[in-house]
């Protein structure tokens, strides 16, 4: 699909033009402070390129799930500060999304100025299931660009959503894929097209149901499919193991049995786990074999034997895609499995493998555990979007650019 890109827009010329950029600035906050600025950092190159060429940039983004109403705790104010720091220029925050203040500020922009709109999800039309409501909101966003405006889609973490500021607005303005979206698509096409073998995929996270589509899509294509995290316990139960009080999707056991029957030679499961008495960072815990989980205890990480086995598989890989932690990495006692897998991927990358971290919790884990982000070939900013792409689904926010 031929999609116009940021390079095309810059070649056409942006000096004096209002350019609406949909960025993904949905960062985690704790007490109003940004705890992981990864997505903000990833948005900077596209914004910088436009500003340097004299564009009048208007940024649309969301934060959290405010349910279509104003929530001061989900204001983009901390994000405006973080952008200003990184761009080394003032980034004013509009007091609304498409209201009087946004219009006034947008009209007052000079060449090379930037404006951040307030959280687009403060307006219920952004995420409405009613296409006419979304179209109405998209038209209001487009109006902010005055005459000769343009739209740049640069929020890869939201391109799988059919939302007003992602999808509908692209129908109202000349539209382009931003540098980040272009780079993300290029990387994912590389791992989904003809990846160099052996190709190993690591999937973690809590629910099998969330990853079923990607398991079905990837299992026939990969050499090894490593499964850890909370979702592994439903697979282990399907093998007949008693998983104690571990996270279990009973309605998915038969599905896991079927997957193991079809792809048992590809799927790699843990052989030991770190079990805990309860779900807390200070819980009593120990590494045990699969038949030794104490009654009522729950597995909160893969065990050391499994970590070594997973690392051995990854050591032979030439292409690696990783999405989802191996355990509750937020608790130090249950972070070892995730760290071991991440370090094995870094080692494989150093030996020449092409590695992609599929956004979401995996990217957060890399940063939380203090690992070198440059040790991976690519860290995606979009967990859900990258999974849907690998499932073979169309991404509405990309398709609409074509």
From Swiss-Prot:
GO terms for biological process: gluconeogenesis; glycolytic process. This is Phosphoglycerate kinase. PANTHER family: PHOSPHOGLYCERATE KINASE, PHOSPHOGLYCERATE KINASE 1, CHLOROPLASTIC-RELATED. The keyword Electron transport does not apply. It comes from Corynebacterium urealyticum (strain ATCC 43042 / DSM 7109). The keyword Isomerase does not apply. One of its GO terms (cellular component) is cytosol. Pathway: Carbohydrate degradation; glycolysis; pyruvate from D-glyceraldehyde 3-phosphate: step 2/5. Its main location: cytoplasm. GO terms for molecular function: ADP binding; ATP binding; phosphoglycerate kinase activity. PROSITE patterns: PGLYCERATE_KINASE. Monomer. It catalyses: (2R)-3-phosphoglycerate + ATP = (2R)-3-phospho-glyceroyl phosphate + ADP.
């Amino acid at each position: 699909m031929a999609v116009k890109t940021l390079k095309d827009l810059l070649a056409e010329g942006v000096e004096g033009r209002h350019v609406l950029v949909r960025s993904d600035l949905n960062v985690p906050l704790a007490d109003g402070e940004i705890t992981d600025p990864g997505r903000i950092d990833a948005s900077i190159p596209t914004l910088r390129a436009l500003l340097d060429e004299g564009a009048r940039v208007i940024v649309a983004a969301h934060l959290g799930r405010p349910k279509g109403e104003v929530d001061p705790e989900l204001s983009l104010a901390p994000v405006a500060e973080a952008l200003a720091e990184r761009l080394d220029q003032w980034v004013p925050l509009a007091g609304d999304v498409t209201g009087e203040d946004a219009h006034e500020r947008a009209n007052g922009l000079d060449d090379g100025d930037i404006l951040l709109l307030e959280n687009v999800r403060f307006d219920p039309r952004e995420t409405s299931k009613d296409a006419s409501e979304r179209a109405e909101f998209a038209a209001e966003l487009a109006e902010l660009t005055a005459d000769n405006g343009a739209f740049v889609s640069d929020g890869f973490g939201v391109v799988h959503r059919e939302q007003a500021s992602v999808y509908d607005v692209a129908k109202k303005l000349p539209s382009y894929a931003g540098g980040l979206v272009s780079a993300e698509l290029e990387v994912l096409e590389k791992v989904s097209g003809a990846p160099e073998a052996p190709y190993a995929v690591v999937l973690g996270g809590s629910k099998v149901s969330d990853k079923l589509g990607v398991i079905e899509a990837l299992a026939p294509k990969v050499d090894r499919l490593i499964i850890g995290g909370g979702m592994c316990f439903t697979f282990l139960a399907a093998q007949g193991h008693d998983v104690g009080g571990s996270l279990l999707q009973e309605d998915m056991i038969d599905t896991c049995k079927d997957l193991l029957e079809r792809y048992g030679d590809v799927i790699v499961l843990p052989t030991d786990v770190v079990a805990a008495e309860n779900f807390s960072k200070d819980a009593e815990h120990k590494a045990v074999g699969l038949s030794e989980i104490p009654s009522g205890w729950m597995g909160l990480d893969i065990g050391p034997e499994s970590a070594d086995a997973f690392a051995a598989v990854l050591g032979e890989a030439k292409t690696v895609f990783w999405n989802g932690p191996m355990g509750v990495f937020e608790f130090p006692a249950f972070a070892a499995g995730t760290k071991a897998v991440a370090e094995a991927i870094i080692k494989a990358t150093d030996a020449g493998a092409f590695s992609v971290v599929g956004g979401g919790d995996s990217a957060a884990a890399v940063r939380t555990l203090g690992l070198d982000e440059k040790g991976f070939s690519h860290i995606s900013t979009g967990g859900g979007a990258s999974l849907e792409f690998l499932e073979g689904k169309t991404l509405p926010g990309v398709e609409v650019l074509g």
